Amino acid sequence: MDFPSRFEVIVIGGGHAGTEAALASARMGVKTLLLTHNVETLGHMSCNPAIGGIGKSHLVKEIDALGGAMALATDMSGIQFRVLNNRKGPAVRATRAQADRAIYKAVVREILENQPNLWIFQQSCDDLIVEQDQVKGVVTQMGLRFFADSVVLTSGTFLGGLIHIGLQNYSGGRAGDPPANALAQRMRELPLRVGRLKTGTPPRIDGRSVDFSVMTEQPGDTPIPVMSFMGNAAMHPRQVSCWITHTNARTHEIIASNLDRSPMYSGVIEGIGPRYCPSIEDKIHRFADKESHQVFIEPEGLTTHELYPNGISTSLPFDVQLEIVRSIRGMENAHIVRPGYAIEYDYFDPRDLKYSLETKVIGGLFFAGQINGTTGYEEAGAQGLLAGTNAALRAQGRESWCPRRDEAYIGVLVDDLITLGTQEPYRMFTSRAEYRLILREDNADLRLTEKGRELGLIDDARWAAFCAKREGIEREEQRLKSTWVRPGTPQGQAVVDKFGTPLAHEYSLLNLLARPEVDYAGLIEATGGEVIDPQVAEQVEIKTKYAGYIDRQQEEIARLRASEDTRLPVDIDYTTISGLSKEIQGKLEQTRPETLGQASRIPGVTPAAISLLLIHLKKRGAGRELEQSA
């Protein structure tokens, strides 16, 4: 039967990609359906109970800057917050939060249920309705048909999901959830390149069976950081510590002697796992010279004894898992609540997508999250927000949008995926961004919120807060620029006493702040300025201290932007361009880049080939002008 009303956008899947996609579409005023196999698992953290980290927090704050839910849900559920790389420069600093799994999920569900224009329905999706290479809707497990001209598929690990524990395996989307095998079969009928990837999770431990006295305590930071630009520390629940222990020679011996029982090393698993989050058996095999590996003992929440031992993800048989866990200091008597496992699943080559995350071959069909070959909640959420936004823009008859590499880590993520593809689960790092001094986590709102408002993603409350912050930064910069300190005056002497730097002549406070030894808080203390919003103070200090470097990056971006944004015609035939080698013609035909900048990042496409493309475009443009004037 057909559902009685029609939707404009349908989102399949209620994980981190699906929730952000559905919320983005609905925030833009588009009638949106979120289809999930189980309402109780909306926003569920399938793996580790943490949000953020190096490169990842930048994505979380960009999602937040565009009105998304992830950062706010983290502030309301975070039970430990830390800033990583705190002693390094602002470009690589990253906020990481340990979350209470149950609270996080409850917050996400509450946000979803209170979002106007969003309907939620519990049913698995078994089929897509496709007519003349255009998606028209979906069919659920019970045969119910929903119609919409845009569908966002965020299937996570559910497409053809196969769970492995030792040499035993069974179908599943994750532990306790069924796979989406009917949909996986339907997807394989479409003209899209499909592959298999793998990820894994460690056994969960009962905290009552662990001896924390022999472990190293790892408390959170003070003052407690926040994740959302709209958040504050008062939102956080009770804060707790994590703990650190290590594997040892005995642990490694147990693993090495049982590799023949590992599905990874016996050839049972075909999919490639995440390079930067390897299983413990992978670590022992690849880093045989290391005597030990860190294990972070992370609490799963405030109302459970379950612990997540980050660092020992494994798919070895249960008896071996028990031996491994009990060989680690502090866990000699540990009770395993849930065994670790690996899961294989289908993903689709992201080179078959446009920048909007719409597939090139099926109009209106968008992919987001692990289906595109990524790993991580943050990467999924970022793609979900972008896909949901573009599905809504399509419904509204507006042009699609994707930030450039110099505008957002979301832009870096998407450009990497659709240009280079991936043969292993893709994880974001700050090192992937060429312009990371500009793309800091602290200025995500200044980079993206204005665009979010234009797109319809930002509500009035967030917009008012953003405008107040932006005006506050301009006002404080102007005050520092126009306030002068002279040698021999009480203020001048206070500056000398505070920082130990003599004043040769008069300086503006902005000039003084640019000095490496001068910090904003100390300068205000010495000169008697008023205490301002910490977010404003942070921006003023970073912009002043790194002004020269930031200006140079902006100049470089401006130089490259002209050719970067030059669009390549949809109907361009690369085989007719003289001078291009057959190999490069083949690469360009396969990838079908949208811009000259994207073409330049395809492996094997040389600068000389880009010059030939530019010449071809100029000739083509001149030829069309002559035709029009004739």
Swiss-Prot record:
Classification via PROSITE patterns: GIDA_1 (PS01280), GIDA_2 (PS01281)
Gene Ontology BP term (one): tRNA methylation
Positions with a binding annotation for FAD: G13, G14, G15, H16, A17, G18
Record-level GO cellular component terms: cytosol
Residue ranges that the Swiss-Prot or TrEMBL entry lists as coiled coil: none
Keywords: Cytoplasm, FAD, Flavoprotein, NAD, tRNA processing
Record InterPro entries: FAD/NAD-bd_sf (IPR036188), GIDA_C_N (IPR049312), MnmG (IPR004416), MnmG-rel (IPR002218), MnmG-rel_CS (IPR020595), MnmG_C (IPR026904), MnmG_C_subdom (IPR047001), MnmG_C_subdom_sf (IPR044920)
GO molecular function: flavin adenine dinucleotide binding
Cofactor: FAD
Gene3D superfamilies: FAD/NAD(P)-binding domain, GidA associated domain, C-terminal subdomain, tRNA uridine 5-carboxymethylaminomethyl modification enzyme MnmG/GidA
Compartments (UniProt record): Cytoplasm
Keyword Secreted: no
Residues annotated to bind NAD(+): 273-287
Top-rank lineage group of the source organism: Bacteria
Cross-referenced PANTHER family: GLUCOSE INHIBITED DIVISION PROTEIN A, PROTEIN MTO1 HOMOLOG, MITOCHONDRIAL
HAMAP family: MnmG_GidA (MF_00129)
Assembly notes: Homodimer. Heterotetramer of two MnmE and two MnmG subunits.
Record family assignment: Belongs to the MnmG family.
Biological role: NAD-binding protein involved in the addition of a carboxymethylaminomethyl (cmnm) group at the wobble position (U34) of certain tRNAs, forming tRNA-cmnm(5)s(2)U34.
Name this polypeptide is given: tRNA uridine 5-carboxymethylaminomethyl modification enzyme MnmG
Gene: mnmG
